[in-house]
């Protein structure tokens, strides 16, 4: 799996870099895309290493840097890192919970050239938001933070991860985005990787709820045209075709973890046998072009049928490799979210069954926890 093939496709220039500066976060969201084994503060890259990585990213052709975590403002050097982005001409997007120390650092971030803020909102109702995020009094902090973002003139995107615990609030999220002065709203149905995979039975909505949420979004897009852009990410388990994960494996994006591993996508470490190179040992350009993890599923040569002969193979790039492994037991299989997969009907049935049952309690995201998935036997068995 790891050996680059002699005829491997050339690597296009990456567009975006997700800089996971830390896994520390005041929230404990049960759908978090971070890995189950979270990196500790003691192993995080230092300021100088991040600055070097950003310089290498700019030289490689990266345009956008998403400063993320965890909660990126938990880093004492977040202002220095953001300034480095500005100095290099990299467009910086702060992905934040807006709680803890985020507000206290916002003015300084603006002063050094922060370009954009993406604020997560777990629910419209404060009590529901606190239950989902696992943090008391988070909502007032988020509202105060959002108001300051708008006051400074920074573009604001609200991000709402949708699941059965808040899908009834989709219309409310849209109203909230307008009220807050956001320019964009992401209505992103949960993608079942990381902690969301563990909590799938607690998070899975039913098909009727999903369809209604899509109808609400489409109506709001028309009503609010020119005022609010609404992005919609539909849930894979109810889709006809899969997403192009990260824009296609090793094609557009890369993810640098707090300890310096460079991944083709958030969940890539769930695939056994892949070798992930670290920025402490290799230059970013070398990792992007030649590292075994990035070359493993870049292009189409690795594909099996029906992907290999499908006319969508360079649209969705076979879907998600991590999801194929989780649901089909083979990272090179057709993503079972695709209607052409022999497992597609079983995946839809699994979602329908879980959505019909009473949801179990959330397994909250926690550093140092020994998490085991409560999920039933998967569809590939």
Swiss-Prot record:
Keywords: 4Fe-4S, Iron, Iron-sulfur, Metal-binding, Oxidoreductase, PQQ biosynthesis, S-adenosyl-L-methionine. CDD domains: Radical_SAM, SPASM_PqqE. It is an enzyme of class 1 (oxidoreductase). SUPFAM superfamilies: Radical SAM enzymes. One of its GO terms (biological process) is pyrroloquinoline quinone biosynthetic process. One of its GO terms (molecular function) is 4 iron, 4 sulfur cluster binding. It catalyses: [PQQ precursor protein] + S-adenosyl-L-methionine = E-Y cross-linked-[PQQ precursor protein] + 5'-deoxyadenosine + L-methionine + H(+). It comes from the Bacteria. Its EC number is 1.21.98.4. Residues 11-223 form the Radical SAM core domain. Its cofactor is [4Fe-4S] cluster. PANTHER family: PQQA PEPTIDE CYCLASE, RADICAL SAM DOMAIN PROTEIN. This is PqqA peptide cyclase. It comes from Methylobacterium radiotolerans (strain ATCC 27329 / DSM 1819 / JCM 2831 / NBRC 15690 / NCIMB 10815 / 0-1).
